[in-house]
Amino acid sequence: MAKSSADDEELRRACEAAIEGTKQSIVMSIRVAKSRGVWGKSGKLGRQMAKPRVLALSVKSKGPRKKAFLRVMKYSSGGVLEPAKMYKLKHLSKVEVITNDPSGCTFTLGFDNLRSQSVAPPQWTMRNTDDRNRLLVCILNICKDVLGRLPKVVGIDIVEMALWAKDNTPVVTTQRSTEDGEPVAESVTESDLKVTVEKELVSQAEEEDMEALLGTYVMGIGEAEAFSERLKRELQALEAANVHAILESEPLVDEVLNGLEAATNIVDDMDEWLGIFNIKLRHMREDIESIETRNNKLEMQSVNNKALIEELDKVIERLRVPSEYAASLTGGSFDEADMLQNIEACEWLAKALRGLEVPNLDPIYANMRAVKEKRAELEKLKATFVRRASEFLRNYFASLVDFMVSDKSYFSQRGQLKRPDHADLRYKCRTYARLLQHLKGLDKNCLGPLRKAYCSSLNLLLRREAREFANELRASTKVSRNPTVWLEGSTGSSQNANTDTSAVSDAYAKMLTIFIPLLVDESSFFAHFMCFEVPALAPPGGAGNDKKSQSNNDDGNDDDDLGIMDIDETDKKPGKNSPDLTALNESLQDLLDGIQEDFYAVVDWAYKIDPLRCISMHGITERYLSGQKADAAGFVRLLLGDLESRVSMQFSRFVDEACHQIERNERNVRQMGVLPYIPRFAALATRMEQYIQGQSRDLVDQAYTKFVSIMFVTLEKIAQQDPKYADILLLENYAAFQNSLYDLANVVPTLAKFYHQASEAYEQACTRHISMIIYYQFERLFQFAKKIEDFMYTITPEEIPFQLGLSKVELRKMLKSSLSGVDKSIAAMYKKLQKNLASEELLPSLWDKCKKEFLDKYESFVQLVAKVYPSENVPGVTEMRGLLASM
């Protein structure tokens, strides 16, 4: 027999080399063939060809514990073994010998930790059954020794495996050296080489029991086949004896069958009787159910009748109209003493109408004739009450206002300004505030005529109060008029310019202080009294009022707390997009329309006395306008906006007239010196700055811009009428403008801008005038220098002396005529500068500018001569500067 690969030491060493460094030792290594196919009926391999592999069993000691592994080795391209896969034997769950292989040399190993159980495990085919048994016995011994358990074995008898292991344990001869170096042979079993397998597959006790059993049959432990045949023969004998015993008991069986047939007949009879009883019971149950159904219907009908009677009682109670409420709604009085009863009747009527509407009333009742008739009756009551209440309130509003208008003590009189007091009027109206709330709930359309009646009546009162107050306010304000002609050419027009006219703006402020809060209060009262759904208003005496308005408040103002929230504490506050807002603004237009004429009259009166007071009035109006934020004060905002426009229009009229006064200077005869409107504008600007209040700065700055623009344009036009003296006129007037506005320009940005503009124009006029004077006295000198400069652009300085008119001789002639008696020429230049100058205070600064300009031009001339005529002597700049300084 060929030697097994399990005994191949070279193979073992190759496996140890392949797992070197893993601290594992090889127990057994053996060559196998790996395949994935199955053995068919023909005995040939299936899908894949077998691949040569080596299975190696290894163990690893870690303290007292041991771990066992099954390694699969494959051959590399160079024929060297290398690890392919490794399985832990602790996961080995099944060892199955393939029955389709007739040789019995193919088996599979099942592991319970493989990821894909759907893939068939590889099949391992050994060379012969001895190699197969040798490998499997080694695996089972290691599992039992190391793991303490055996995997499931399928396809082979484990007893046969144990018997094979006992008979085929190989003896391996090893050599060891003695002390003298001679080898000595020693015999050990394979199981003693690496792992001690003292625990066998079948225990000693089991083997002794098996020998005792076989001994009873006078057989040895190795005669298993004979023992099996003997057991089969005994089993067949026992089965034959059982059949014989059954045949002997046939009479007994017949007797039992007869008894069973009699019992079956009795059972059939009982079943028939039970069927009869069941039919009778079913009929009885049907009768009982019929009786119960009729009884239940009667009970339900009784309950329904009772509930129906209760519901009808409720409906009748709901449809009943109390006599006291019917009397109040159809013919009751609207006196103050009876208002509580009227309110209760209104509340009952509104509740009754809501109760007959579908959401609050069952839809079944809504179509009943009695309900329809009662609803029609309630609608008739509602229409009657709304008509009576509306007629009463219209007459009541008219009578209240007529009473107040007929009493002159309510209005301002000669020598006595009276603040309008509507506390009593509002108190009387508040008596009917809740009535209006209920009228709105009953019929919204009835409020339109009531609002118009209230607005019409109260408008008469407000216009009368404003007219009387404005007339007395103008009559009681004593102040002399300021001139409206500020910038005219006449000298006497500004003599009264400093008259104190503050009483005018105070009167206007007083008019606003008294009437703007009154109009806001009236708007607020009207919005809530007439049930407009708008947001709450600011309280009276808001942002637009000053201390003076607070000091004028008398005790009657305590009644201005109208108690609007007391009308209906559950009144909601809708947003600013309320649909009532448009209707409210239209009603406020009717309420307050026409009162603006009296405010316009005060503005026009103030303008006639002092146009500049428009500045103060503009600031006062702007302050009140910024304080009106509430929606119900919409008309008051419009009124203040119109007043602001009126004030701005009057002030613009004043500005336009003043501009026309400035432009009229242009048509005068030749003018010299400072024009009269220059210093007068400074006085006007000073006065305007004193009147600025609040947001009036933009208005004043616009006026400044228009004034100064016209002034500068007119000045330029006047100067162009006489070009000979134009620069003198310009520099004198621009200097006067700067001098008169120096202080204001430091604090007013708009005037500062024009101040810098005038400064630039002054410098330009000075430069032109001084250049003219210098050229007048030294014309030949600087014309000669101009010719030299012109030639220097085209030829070299050395060639210039050879040009016509620029020779050295010509230079000497020119110097002699221009610089001989230069002191006289300079004195003449000073006299000419002084001759036409009306403002003597400008002469020193102009003369300094003139000397500086002359020295600069002369220095340029000397430098040109030094370049072109280096050998010629010219008086130096230092000499000329000394001469100018001595004069």
From Swiss-Prot:
Residues 221-248, 281-301 form a coiled coil. It is found in: Cytoplasm, Cytosol; Cell membrane; Cytoplasm, Cytoskeleton, Phragmoplast; Secreted, Extracellular exosome. It holds the Pfam family Sec3_C-term. One of its GO terms (cellular component) is phragmoplast. One of its GO terms (biological process) is exocytosis. Keywords: Cell membrane, Coiled coil, Cytoplasm, Cytoskeleton, Exocytosis, Membrane, Secreted, Transport. Residues 542-581 are annotated as: Disordered. Residues 555-569 have a biased composition (Acidic residues). It is a peripheral membrane protein. Disruption phenotype: Embryonic lethality. InterPro entries: Sec3-PIP2_bind, Sec3_C, Sec3_CC. The exocyst complex is composed of SEC3, SEC5, SEC6, SEC8, SEC10, EXO70A1 and EXO84B. Interacts with EXO70A1, SEC5A and ICR1, but not with ICR2. Binds to EXO70H1. Binds directly to B1L. Component of the exocyst complex involved in the docking of exocytic vesicles with fusion sites on the plasma membrane during regulated or polarized secretion. Involved in polarized cell growth and organ morphogenesis. During cytokinesis, involved in cell plate initiation, cell plate maturation and formation of new primary cell wall. During cytokinesis, involved in cell plate initiation, cell plate maturation and formation of new primary cell wall. PANTHER family: EXOCYST COMPLEX COMPONENT 1 ISOFORM X1 (PTHR16092:SF14), SEC3/SYNTAXIN-RELATED (PTHR16092). This is Exocyst complex component SEC3A. It comes from Arabidopsis thaliana (Mouse-ear cress).
